[in-house]
């Protein structure tokens, strides 16, 4: 009897296995429900922030004539792309999470959603690279930039960026099994496999080269600003004088005073020649101090946007390279979920950065707020005396 009881309660008993399995499922079900709830809340928050923030920035740029400039046109394009991504791609992710990480639509719709997700990723990379080039031209070659960077030039740049993005995202549509639903990521996206299985390595290299080239341009701009951080010293040109009548590039009003006082003979000296020369040198400057500060502020804002794009996308890019170079690899589910949600958060970060680092957008936002939400202006304090 003892042996019978021991054998019936041993680890090989099927009833014990069923009980242990049921206990494991019951223990894992609450954690899975909590994970699903957290994902839904986070993605819903990302969608709301992205839609509201990007639409507000877009409306401010469209309504304010002072913002009708090349950098704000590019910012408008970025905001509209993030708005479409949040409104079209993210709701399908919400539905797939709600259905237990399953795609309930057709295969064609999955390909369309995956195509749009890859399209917006490459669009942001190409646009940030073009913005970095224009920021460098605005400071290093301001005269050429002010003449050539017109509205139609901006339209041409935007069209070129969208064309290149479509060229990068469209070919996988015809490849069998390239765009598919990835259960671990809860989304339809490019299936990153071993580099000998498909062309995923070429796409990842193109994205990495774009991000690297963008930061190289900003580093070059930083070096240019560092070299030109100090003003050149004024070189004083001495005036010419034979009989106390100073003339030449360095002549000042003292020559006229000497002539009136009786020093020297002859006609009135050209006293303002040196001043005219200085004004001529000032007109030759390519970029004034106020313009330089404005361009530098815009460059700082766009670089922070680029930096956040790198920070939020780099973990997912690392996971993609992991799949490409390691055959039959297993990425930890928690790490992969975190990287995917970081890439989703990138769609709502740009408006926050713009309102924090751009004074013009901040003023435009405060001007359109109701009076109850505005902060009262601080009045200047006048000195007073206590008797």
Swiss-Prot record:
InterPro entries xref list: GPCR_Orphan/Phoenixin, GPCR_Rhodpsn, GPCR_Rhodpsn_7TM
Gene3D superfamilies given in the database record: Rhodopsin 7-helix transmembrane proteins (1.20.1070.10)
Subcellular location: Cell membrane
Transmembrane portions of the chain: 41-61, 88-108, 112-132, 154-174, 203-223, 302-322, 336-356
A molecular function (GO) term: G protein-coupled receptor activity
Any GO CC annotation of this UniProt entry: plasma membrane
Source organism, top-level taxon: Eukaryota
Keywords, ordered alphabetically: Cell membrane, Disulfide bond, G-protein coupled receptor, Glycoprotein, Membrane, Receptor, Transducer, Transmembrane, Transmembrane helix
Disulfide pattern: 110-188
Glycan attachment sites: 5, 198
Membrane topology term: Multi-pass membrane protein
UniProt key word Disulfide bond: yes
Residues in compartment: Extracellular: 1-40, 109-111, 175-202, 323-335
Cytoplasmic-side positions: 62-87, 133-153, 224-301, 357-387
Keyword Glycoprotein attributed: yes
Family of this protein: Belongs to the G-protein coupled receptor 1 family.
Role noted for this protein: Is a receptor for the SMIM20 derived peptides Phoenixin-14 and Phoenixin-20. It mediates the Phoenixin-14 and Phoenixin-20 augmentation of gonadotropin-releasing hormone (GNRH) signaling in the hypothalamus and pituitary gland. In the ovary, it mediates the effects of Phoenixin-14 and Phoenixin-20 induced granulosa cell proliferation during follicular growth.
This protein's name: Probable G-protein coupled receptor 173
Organism: Danio rerio
